[in-house]
Structure formats: C-alpha cells, structure tokens
Amino acid sequence: MTKNIKRKKTRMALLVVLLALILAVLAVVCVYETELNKLDSNDGVDNSFYDSQFSQFKDKKIMVIVPHEDDDLMAMGQMLPQLYKNGTDVRIVFATNGDKRVSAYTRQTEACNALEKLGIPREKVIFLGYPDGTNMYVKKAGEKSYSYSTGLDHTYSGKGFREYHFQKFGTHAEYTVENMIYDIENVILDYRPDYIIAIDFDPHTDHRGVSMSFETAMSRILKSENDYQPKILKTFCYSSEWKAKPDFYSLNIKSVHKPIKEKLSDPTYETNVPQYNWDDRVRIPVYKGSVSHSILRCPEYKALGEHLSQFAFVYSDRIINGDMVYWTRRTDNLLNDASVSVSSGRAELINDFKFVGVKKIKSPHAKLSGCVSKFDKNDAEKTVTVKFKHPKTISCISLYDDFDLDSNITSGILSFSDGSSINVNALNGDGSETKVVFAPKSGITSFTFKVTGYEKSAGLCEIEAFEKADYDPGFSLIKLKNADTDDYIYNYFIGPNEKSLNLGAYVSDQNAEFSIKLTDGEGVKLEGNKLVFDDGFKKCTVRAELNNDHSTYDQITIERLSEKGLRSYESFEKVNRILFKIDSLRLKTKNIFVNGYFYETLHKFVKNALKKVGINIK
C-alpha cells in the first residue's frame, strides 16, 4: 500500500515537473514570438511596386528562365509570389533536369513543392528536360551529350512530369545546344511574356550555357518578330547570392552589395559580364512580407527548404536580401531590322544580342571568346556599315568596345545617310556602353562607324541604335535607402545614440524628380534628405513620391531602440542564429532519409574522419 502511494506521488511529481517544463517552454516561445512580432511589424511600410490596387503588373505576363530547379528562387523568389497574388501571370522555365547527381523526378518535385510554398501552382512550371552539368553548349555538330544519371541522349522528365518538347511536338529532343535554343525560342513565342527574367553569365557550366542559349534565341526572335519587344532583365545567382557574403543577421536587412572580386570569373571587372557597371543595376525592392528578423519566418527560406537535395536552405543567409538586382537588356535595338557588314572581322557578332561567350565552359576562369568582332590590323578602313530595311528615326547609338583593357578604340566617326556625321571620342575601355546621344535624325536608311584611332587592336562587341535614348523599363519605381550604406530601408531601427540618418532614393527613371516628407513622428525633422533626431525621438514614418506621379511611392518607418532594446535584440539575434543552425540540421537529416543519402552521408563522414588522422581514401 505504502509503495503504491510512493509511486503515485513520484508520478505526480514527475507530471508536475513535466508540466512546469512545458509551461516554461511555452512562456519562452510566447516571449520570443512577441519580440519577433515587434521587430517584424511593418505597419506603415508600403511600396507602390506591390500595391494591389494600383498594380502595374496586373494581367501582365512574366517568364523566368533559369538552368536549375532552385535558381528561380534566387532569380526572383522574394518578388514573384506577391506579383502573382496581385494578378500577374507567371511561367517558370527550368532548362535542365538538374540530374547530374540527383534524379530528375527529385529535382522537379522539389521545384514544384517550393513554388507551391510561395503560392505558385504546379501548372505554372515548365521543364525543358536538358542534361545537367555537361558541355553540350560548346560541342560541335554530331557530338553526343548524355545525362550523367540516366545515360539518355534526349530530353526527358521525371515520373508524373512531361518535358516541353515532348508536350509540344510529341517527340523527345536530342541533347544539342541548337535544340535547347529552339525550345527556348518556342516557349517564349508560345507564351509571349511582357517581361522575361533570365539567368546571366555566372561561373557555372549550365548558367553560362543557358544564358548564351537564351541570348541566341532572343536574337532570333527580335530579328523575326519586330513587333514583339519584351522587357528583359538578366540576373546572376552565384556572385550576388549563392557565393555572396552571409549578411542576413543584422539590425536592418542588407541589400545585395557589389560582388567580392575573388568570387568573379575575372576580378578585373565589376561583374561576370564586363559590359555591366554595378551602378547601372536595376534594384527591385522585395515585398515587405518576404523578410523577417528570423530567417525561419521568411517565405523564401521555407521554399528553399523544399530543395533538400541541394542544401539550398544552408545559403539562405546569403540569398535573402533587401533588394533583387538585375541588368536591363534593351529589345528595341533598330539593328534588329538591319543588315550589318564590316570591312574586316565578323559582322554577325555586332548585333547578336550576346555580350559574352566562352569555349572552355566548365572552367570558372576561362577566357571569354566568340563575342568581339576584331578588325584586321592591316585593314585601312576599319568600318562597320549598317543598312536598315526601312527608314528609321535615330537619336542614340550605343557602342561596346572590346572589353580587353589593353585594346581600345580611342576615336571614331559616325556617318549617316542624310549626310551628317558625329565625331566619337574614346569608347569605354572596359567594354561597357558608350552612349552617343544626339537630336533625332529622321528617314535614316544607313549609317557607318569608322575607327580613326585605337590602341593595340580595334574591336567591337555590339552596336545598338535607338529611336529614343531613354529606355522605359515597363514599370515605375521609387525606393528609399540609407544614403551612406546604399541599403534599402523598410522598417528601420536606429541605436539609442544615433542623431541622424541620410536618406537617398533609387528611382527607375533617373530623370524623374521626387520629394521626401515626414508623415508622422515627434522629435524628428527633415533637413533636405537628412533626418535629424532629438533625444525624445521614438518613431516616425517617411514617404517618398515622384513629383509628376504620386501613385509611385515608397513609405518606410524609422524606430529608435533603447539601450535595453538594443541588448535585447543582440540576444535575440544569437538565438535566431542557433535556431537557423538547428533547423538546417533538421533539413539535412530529413534529406538523408527522404532522398536515400544515408550511405553516401556515412561514407563522407568516415572519409573525413580518416582524413583527420592522415588516411586519405581516393
């Protein structure tokens, strides 16, 4: 009897302890969630880019073209879901099956699951079905390419999926670069998107190959479909995301910053495409609901977590940023309706919509080739002749010099069919755009560009001619930023001793004028574009608008943290880092069992353990 009473008391005590532990855990969770909600509060934060009432993208069509199943999230994962929710029709095109080490079924299932996490249904996804990690893009005609995992030499898809070529033509396409170009061309023309987001020339085999294939396909489309001129934005997934600095954990969200030189294919330039200047990038703000002070709350992290086989979630602290960065490729080039000839060199390279190319596609630091038309040194003329099929009105010509820093065109002359001419000074030696703007010339049937001076050798990558010098990107945008750090601002926190904040603004139309004003808040004043805080400041709201279009706006909040609040945040950040590591471990463990990597993981563990004691297994 006494023993039973003791057992009951012991059980009761254990239950009480367990209940106390549960209550303690719940209390900690409640405190954590409360603090997180305070930090993440975006009341008062808004941007017209995502305004559902005045959506610029409602009933518009966007197509994303990327190599692998997960690149879509890096290309526009923080932007696309809200645009889709606001009425934009989207298509995500995956060029390869991502099947070098993992099955196509696994990659395709992960991609669909990830997009569904963001609210984008499976029917919006298109798989082209080409192989992953091959040098198919630079092989000569007749040379075969095969899938590493299946040995197939033609497009295919995982169980339950159908690749694009088979759906459209009823047959599989042989693995050739020409077939990929053909499929990209067809999928674009089938859908005719208003906007195309495409991968750019990352130091990765498939990223380079798909970028070059897309540009070739686009060149063919623009030359055959003169009435179709989509807005094109190209983006990098490696230098600005996958291999960027892991800077998620900070008091305020960081924007994408200039790539680390050592991470680039050629550190001579600012990006992996020499023609791109960092300051010319297009900076799209992310939707306010896509960021949180806890990475586990970010929708993109949840989507990346579906890509178990790629461990994409591990890089979330690099991928999730305060903006998304692109470069515009204009499609209104008048040379698309013209013939081009040269006194020497390769005329086809001058208007092929392609800035860069490479032969050794697998080498991260391979020398760029096949993209510059070089004049023979003995050529006394060194002239490009452009003849239009129909008379044109021209107000701007863009010249792209050979990006070899030692080979520069130092002077030239543009001559037009109306008898006029323009002297051209030295072109930008890094190959970036040299824009020659002039009063509109009407009825132009042809023009020439003659090199009159050069260093080492003379060559041109591209020539473009436009009716209008300024380009309409297809949307209107303004976004406030920290003028000192260049980071975009959303719900922004300042420390207890900060007395001012210099504001700047990114505007999609660089010629547009804008105004910044305080809409509420005490203890703060606006001096020009500088916010000045006094000791009593707590919180304010700031709004920026275009002067000629008040429907294009941005609104942010600024809040001061006390000493206690700042210490609390620092502790909070440490907890978040730990939670991120724990959840990453959870997802890695899940991958071992879901994708059958148990023995592969065990093998790596044993191999690394033996390596530490000096035993190397090849």
Give residue ranges: language-model regions.
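N-terminal Lys/Arg-rich, disordered targeting/topogenic segments
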Residues: 1-10
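Active-site beta-strand->loop->alpha-helix modules in alpha/beta enzyme cores, enriched
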Residues: 10-20, 24-227
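The feature marks non-catalytic terminal segments
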Residues: 18-31, 42-53, 110, 116-118, ...
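Aromatic, loop-rich ligand-recognition surfaces of beta-strand-rich domains
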Residues: 363-421, 430-472
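Short, exposed coil/turn segments at beta-strand boundaries within extracellular/luminal domains
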Residues: 455-457, 546-555
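Extracellular interdomain linker/stem segments of modular secreted and single-pass surface proteins
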Residues: 469-470, 559-567
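Predominantly extracytoplasmic/ectodomain segments of secreted and cell-surface proteins
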Residues: 473-512, 529, 533-538, 552-554, ...
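Short, solvent-exposed loop/linker segments at beta-strand-coil boundaries, enriched for Pro/Gly
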Residues: 512, 516-524
